[in-house]
Swiss-Prot record:
GO terms for cellular component: cytosolic large ribosomal subunit. The keyword Ribosomal protein applies. Forms part of the ribosomal stalk which helps the ribosome interact with GTP-bound translation factors. GO terms for biological process: translation. It comes from Shewanella pealeana (strain ATCC 700345 / ANG-SQ1). Belongs to the universal ribosomal protein uL11 family. NCBIfam families: L11_bact. SUPFAM superfamilies: Ribosomal L11/L12e N-terminal domain, Ribosomal protein L11, C-terminal domain. This is Large ribosomal subunit protein uL11. The gene is rplK. The keyword RNA-binding applies.
């Protein structure tokens, strides 16, 4: 018989840096999950990522206080800023451009995000990532 799901918790945690402090501790504590067990498992699973990279995670909590979790790919905005070599996007993206990014880099990011995105094909996903880049004040070049 399958376990009864008590709830889902969605967080963004830095790779290899999960610890009991906020936001992880309070979110897991209110569901009665063993916080240190999650932190150790998450840090072990995210070793392959660059330290400090934000990793979205969906934690499924069961009625017996056990849990499973699924890590997603890093946010497109983080990957775009990293590819462009910037710290942050533009506060006024329509008037103030902060950098440029090659279309090939956008295509690479779309391929990385393909597992998490619901899109018809890679071209549609690439256009979606290009839109994200433009909304951050980045100019997409060929």
């Amino acid at each position: 018989m399958a376990k009864k799901v008590d709830g889902y918790i969605k967080l963004q945690v830095a790779a290899g840096a999960a610890n009991p402090s906020p936001p992880v501790g309070p979110a897991l504590g209110q569901k009665g999950v063993n916080i240190m067990e999650f932190c150790k498992a998450f840090n072990a699973r995210t070793e392959k990522f660059e330290k400090g990279m934000p990793i979205p995670v969906v934690i499924t909590v069961y009625s017996d206080r056990s849990f499973t979790f699924e890590t997603k790919t890093p946010p497109a905005s983080f990957l775009l800023l990293k590819a462009a070599g910037l710290k942050s996007g533009s506060g006024r993206p329509n008037t103030e451009k902060v950098g440029t990014i090659k279309r090939s880099a956008v295509q690479e990011i779309a391929e990385t995000k393909a597992a998490d995105m619901t899109g018809a094909d890679i071209e549609a996903m690439t256009r979606s990532i290009e839109g994200t880049a433009r909304s951050m004040g980045l100019v997409v070049e060929d």
